[in-house]
Amino acid sequence: MIQMQTILNVADNSGAKEVMCIKVLGGTHHMIAHLGDVIVVSIKSSIPKGKVKKGEVCKALIIRTKCGVTRHDGSNIKFDSNDVVLLNKQGEPFGTRIFGSVPRELRVKNFSKIVSLAEEVL
């Protein structure tokens, strides 16, 4: 569960390391984001020669959360950290690689480009 002011790690090679959630998108009463939701983030730390700089505001997709998701077969999947992938205005990822694994629920939510860039799909 991600809410405003949550610090998240970036799991792609866009140049950002840490971001902070500043808005959860999706309606007036949508205050908590879960796996596969799009949020607005502010870049808190980045590498010097990255595609994004510190202080920029962009959209991000949540790909891993500590608070897990329950699947239809009853299994529960959790991760060790809260991670996002940065998106451009067209909804495509900034980076060309995604580190770590992503859940297969992202394919159902029409993020097949991110699933294809990932190292492993759980």
From Swiss-Prot:
InterPro entries: Ribosomal_uL14 (IPR000218), Ribosomal_uL14_bac-type (IPR005745), Ribosomal_uL14_CS (IPR019972), Ribosomal_uL14_sf (IPR036853). GO terms for molecular function: large ribosomal subunit rRNA binding; structural constituent of ribosome. SMART domains: Ribosomal_L14. Keywords: Ribonucleoprotein, Ribosomal protein, RNA-binding, rRNA-binding. Gene3D superfamilies: Ribosomal protein L14. One of its GO terms (biological process) is translation. The keyword RNA-binding applies. GO terms for cellular component: cytosolic large ribosomal subunit. The keyword Translocase does not apply. Belongs to the universal ribosomal protein uL14 family. HAMAP family: Ribosomal_uL14. Part of the 50S ribosomal subunit. Forms a cluster with proteins L3 and L19. In the 70S ribosome, L14 and L19 interact and together make contacts with the 16S rRNA in bridges B5 and B8. Binds to 23S rRNA. Forms part of two intersubunit bridges in the 70S ribosome. This is Large ribosomal subunit protein uL14. The gene is rplN.
